[in-house]
Amino acid sequence: MSEDEILKIIAEGESSTVEFKRKSPELLKLAKEISAIANTKGGYLFIGVDDDRKIYGIDSEKEEKNKIETATHFFLEPTLDLEIYPINIKKKEILMAIIPNSEFKPHKVLIAEPNNITKKRAYIRVGEKSIEASSEMARLMTYQNPNNRKELNISISEKEKRLFNYLEKYERITVKEYCKLTNISKRTAERSLVSLVRAGIIQIHNDSANDYFTLV
């Protein structure tokens, strides 16, 4: 990638595929950013560039690279292999990590809790923010993983018919609204909605508050 191409990416600012860090944050935060980009559609992580696109540079390539590799290999499951390059730009050195659009989603962050309990949480990008993926989004990513693909059997019952009628009238629905509409549990609602997304009948939309679903 040429210097002009890199400068163009930086000039366009943060997005669903680009994250800037003036310096590497603590490892858990770094893992969340990497998880979010890999679980969305891949992209770039720049160290030494601030949110306002100003290039500050880094003090130690080795230290910053080690932080990224540690976050990736010890705080993510499954782990990711990133391409990490030091780049001299405007007389300053920055680090660029290329994060793949992974096939093996969701990449979950391992979060240590008291009593030796480890939580696993997936993250996604919504605009320039990294947010925790909803359980239905994480479930959908799991089904799309080539290691977990199963034959899809769809049956349209009364609850799906009520869902379609609701969407034709109101255009969108959340899991909570679907539970209330059909008097089913959250788990059952998620399974039903994810199956319909996989079948291409409805689509999921990521929102910083709640994911919602619409007809295709």
What are these regions (language model features)?
Residues M1-V216:
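Conserved N-terminal catalytic/coupling substructures associated with nucleotide/phosphate chemistry
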